[in-house]
Amino acid sequence: MIRMKTLCTLTAIVALAAVLGGCASGGPKRPPAGTAEPDKFLFDRGNENLARKRWIAAREYYRQLVDSYPQSPYRADAKLGVGDTYMGEKTAESYVLAINEFREFLNFYPTNKRAHYAQFRLATAHFSQMKSAMRDQTETREAIKEFQNYVTRYADQPLIGEARDHLRQAKDRLDEWDLGVAEHYFRIKWYPGAIGRLVPMLRTDPEFTGRDKAYYMLGASYEKVNKPAEALPFYEKLVKEFEQSEYLEQAKRRIDDLKATLPSAQGVGKGALQ
């Protein structure tokens, strides 16, 4: 039922976009009669309008090429161009339409030399719709999935560095959501809840940029539930992995205090992440 509702919504958006696009641009763009290479004419005009951020006009040229010249060598790039025009509009509706275009490209042209670009733009469309850490993270999860697909399949492509950066940002956003929930549990003194949220998060993503706070909160939570031997490794990981952190000095003090009170600091528990 949800899938059908989503499909109906997408169909309605596509139909509305076609109507509005046609009205705004004066109708379909066609090459002048007698043009030697009409498909190239449409492609060049689409590129010119795309460069000038004339999204609707560019889309009409690309669309005419895609629909009228199925054997054109420019057809695949024009299909990408349609997606890029929707990306340029930067609205919730246009991102949905862009995602549809890039998914179709990957289905129609899975071995095309620009398939990597379609995958990158697909991931970016989700990335551009990510919400703040304590709001719905559906788009964040989709961005992670699609950027991970890019990193897995296209590690030798020039956009790999940017893809990895965006993947890291998306993972951090999702981790910040878990961290926020854990912080709430810590604040209301439900320390098992904080531990139960943070440990799986760090196991799943040990490279979380904000893990210094997670380490400190875990150490403090284990101390609160009278498990100092479990707390110590998290304070030590914080000190070892971060030269700068607002929790660094506090962690060092907790390490000194725990080592002074534990029967033997040597061989103390390795921590719940092991």
Region annotations inferred by a language model:
Residues 2-7, 20-274:
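Acidic, polar-rich low-complexity tracts and alpha-helical solenoid repeat scaffolds
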